[in-house]
Amino acid sequence: VARHAGGSWAAKEAFIKAWSCALFGHPPFIGGDEVDWREIEVIHDEWNRPAIALHGRVAAACEESLGPSSSWKVLVSISHDGACAIAQVAIVDATA
């Protein structure tokens, strides 16, 4: 359980960093201390592949800053090694 929670938390943090990088040169839409982490949900499909589901203010701010959610896609990778977890997130153009 702790291993799963660590990977999910790492993915949420990585999402915030990827979103910030996508807005390079512009101020963040939500300050780091204002993020409601419950609005960033790590989900898995039936093959246990991770994805990010956004809710509430975070979802609205992403659409405002990045455009309609149909125009971008969040790619997630989570890895574990013993007690350590790491995640990578990329926000890419879904229309390309």
Locations of regions flagged by a protein language model:
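Core catalytic alpha/beta fold that binds nucleotide/phospho-ligands
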Residues: 1-96
